[in-house]
Amino acid sequence: MLYKGDTLYLDWLEDGIAELVFDAPGSVNKLDTATVASLGHALDVLEKQSDLKGLLLRSEKAAFIVGADITEFLSLFLVPEEQLSQWLHFANSVFNRLEDLPVPTISAVNGYALGGGCECVLATDYRLATPDLRIGLPETKLGIMPGFGGSVRLPRLLGADSALEIIAAGKDVGADQALKIGLVDGVVAAEKLRDGALAILRQAMNGDLDWKAKRQPKLEPLKLSKIEAAMSFTIAKGMVAQTAGKHYPAPITAVKTIEAAARLGREEALVLENKSFVPLAHTNEARALVGIFLNDQYVKAKAKKLTKDVETPKHAAVLGAGIMGGGIAYQSAWKGVPVVMKDISDKSLTLGMTEAAKLLNKQLERGKIDGLKLAGVISTIQPTLEYSGFDRVDVVVEAVVENPKVKKAVLAETESKVRPDTVLASNTSTIPISELASVLQRPENFCGMHFFNPVHRMPLVEVIRGEKTSDNTIAKVVAWASKMGKTPIVVNDCPGFFVNRVLFPYFAGFSQLLRDGADFRKVDKVMEKQFGWPMGPAYLLDVVGIDTAHHAQAVMAAGFPQRMQKDYRDAIDALFDANRFGQKNGLGFWRYKDDSKGKPKKEEDAAVDSLLADVSQPKRDFSDEEIIARMMIPMVNEVVRCLEEGIIASPAEADMALVYGLGFPPFHGGAFRWLDTIGSAKYLDMAQQYQHLGPLYEVPAGLRDKARHNEAYYPQVEPARPVGALKTA
């Protein structure tokens, strides 16, 4: 043994070949600060070996290196810029030393090599991979850019276009694509990986492969003519501006950095990467996006713990076909859980099967599946007008019309047709679960399972615990949702549960703005362009359906009369009374016409202004700041109330539900992260300016208390240790 650290070791093989093996405690390898330091110590040893002829890098884990240790990021990002820059310089000196070894080097890459893992293997001369490879640089999704030389080596290895596509989008690619673009040099079966890598290494050692020529382009300026460079970087900047926009500075910073470094050698280019990385790491956007990553890990770990003692449902059923039922059936079947889809109407069953077939055909068109797979999946969806097959299902989700009487009747009837241990769930969006459970003989086997539309795209499933719901029922439904590829978040019962309960105060803020003379177009523009929502409130209402919102608003008002009962006729009422239901009938705040792809495209409709004039004060202008405050305060206050009342268990789960269920702008990190970024005291000052608007603007007592003590909702992270200490960790 030449060297042994906590996360890697170095040993001799034969013929002067050394083997550096990543083998951290736990299930995965991460390129954390300690591992970077340990890699440096291993290189200290290697550089002294006069008989070294070649170096193999490999992993003892199922994945090579899954990336940096994201849990370290928040503390690293709090250190002063100069200190962070010094540590990056140290880390890059380690990878440069690996790249500059006077012998050929190869990485045997299995499974994941992401972020720092990818940057590590880029420093070796050759890369041999297994078919399960996922390799790439996802840093821009975390609000930063590659910091261990990825923005320097990848363009010089692949060419500007392929590298820009991976780095700017934060992409990873599979084995076939990596081989095609030159990111790896070969793909072999897992059992042949080590021997295959050693064979390539010996070819390089024997002179059959020119490893020095392979290494040289990574040390030199990017080989691009002025015209090629202008085209590549202009196109990349245009694409980034279109997709990322101003709220996500990392992708455009990465592109500009690669462009500026294109005519520089490795050392000078790394200096530019360092200078670009450090300011990004100190942005609110980076903290928010890293926070989302950590919250996502927390939510998934919680679901895994919750389901460890239950068996994932093997057969499921959906009550109610149509678009929603068909979407749920597709998602279950697509992920390997056969499903019975029942309705009382042939027409609805046809609609549900058509929806499932349409989604599968899209997968076929994209090359994700072949015709055989399509036929196999669709055959696991059994449409029926009867209860045939219900005796073998483990879980049933009801997705019929949002009417408590209808839902109760359907659920009670279904309960009599299934096994005593079968779990029933309702896809209701607002009706309290305990109310629906009142007609059931086994309420402990019943819970809410709120999917979001479109089911195949929206990651969130709210799992709602009623008064009598058992832990086993919750665990089974969470297991099914996880199997379907969704992110389940468990919430307690109340009207609207969590997501809709906090959405309708936001809509109420919008209605009050329109009542006071705001133009809905301006409000939408501000909330989209300035705050960052994917849709403004008017557009969102049109997509949800004005009739759906009108009904849900009444349910929420009955549930929370003190805050959500309004004493005036609003824009939603006016449009509803005029039969303008949004996209579903082509008329809402906008008029809709299908484009060439069959997607509804919004157009101005002057008739709306005269309709809204009856429920509004004369038009007046509002500042962007006032629009954002009046829209967001009601939502944030309600989010805080949900935490205080135990409807949602933690700030992390609340923020993930908002991001995954409503499209809350990820660069804000969710309501609690946004609150912490603003500061509770500053938020209280802002909210108090609008408390005259009514109870929705009254800040909850717990938040007032936080403001008094200047406390945050997330645990406060301490800055990382000084860079000198990090070096020798």
Curated annotation (Swiss-Prot):
Pathway assignment: Lipid metabolism; fatty acid beta-oxidation
One GO MF term: enoyl-CoA hydratase activity
GO cellular component: a single term: fatty acid beta-oxidation multienzyme complex
Binding site for substrate: D296, N500, Y660
The enzyme's E.C. designation: 4.2.1.17, 5.1.2.3, 5.3.3.8, 1.1.1.35
Gene Ontology process terms (BP): fatty acid beta-oxidation
Domain of life: Bacteria
Chain coiled-coil ranges: none
Keywords associated with the record: Fatty acid metabolism, Isomerase, Lipid degradation, Lipid metabolism, Lyase, Multifunctional enzyme, NAD, Oxidoreductase
Function field: Involved in the aerobic and anaerobic degradation of long-chain fatty acids via beta-oxidation cycle. Catalyzes the formation of 3-oxoacyl-CoA from enoyl-CoA via L-3-hydroxyacyl-CoA. It can also use D-3-hydroxyacyl-CoA and cis-3-enoyl-CoA as substrate.
Subunit-level organization: Heterotetramer of two alpha chains (FadB) and two beta chains (FadA).
Protein name (Swiss-Prot/TrEMBL): Fatty acid oxidation complex subunit alpha
Organism: Klebsiella pneumoniae subsp. pneumoniae (strain ATCC 700721 / MGH 78578)
Encoding gene per record: fadB
